[in-house]
Amino acid sequence: MALIAPSLLAADLARLGEALETIKATGASLVHVDVMDGHFVPDITVGQPVVASLRKATDLVLDVHLLIERPERYVADFVEAGADRLSVHIEATPHLHRALDLIRGRGAKAGVALNPATPIESLAEVWGEIDFVNVLTADPALDEAAFIPASVAKVRAASQAREEHRLGFVLQVEGGVTAANLEELARAGADILVVGSAIFKSVDPQTQLSTMMRKAAGMGLTSKV
């Protein structure tokens, strides 16, 4: 099955249980959780206790995105809380190797996230240590951020780097993803598309998610996580 990763950041945080049920009902296998600290990004969202509660409530794969400063200080806590996949920002730490080693050492999949202005070439020193790359195609924020069309070229560059260096990382895209740009991103090489507002701000989130999953399936997106 094609993989769309619904982002809980766009859901009603007082009704996360219902959001999980909606996701599960569509057959989706992964849910995305954004953790913001108010320093690396202006907003504050959820922490380890919420991730732990989500873990108790669902068997969906928990894809946790740390938008926090010095993430290496907290990766062990989030893996212990139940994160199956954990991504940290290259811009947020001078100790990226350490952060990735800590994640993988705890048994989770290790990813690196890149802000829109950060070039894909910045990952050259850690290509062999990452399980997935999360390319942000909008500036991270609680409010719905505008999709940056120029980011498609970066997705394509990441896909080309994977082929050239014979790497096995999964290519994930997050930020302003909608049914309108899903096809373009898939053709650029995206394996996983993180979708928030386009699902949870719609009139019928379950139907919208199902529709996007069917469209992604037609594009041949990967089901690997």
Give the location of each predicted region.
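Conserved N-terminal beta1-alpha1 strand-loop-helix module at the mouth
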Residues: M1-S87, T93-H95, L102-G105, K109-A110, ...
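Active-site/ligand-binding-proximal alpha/beta "capping" segment
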Residues: F132, A138-D139, A146-I192, A198
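Alpha-helical scaffolding within the catalytic cores
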Residues: T118-E121
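A short, mixed-charge helix-start or loop-turn motif at secondary-structure junctions
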Residues: A2, P140-A141
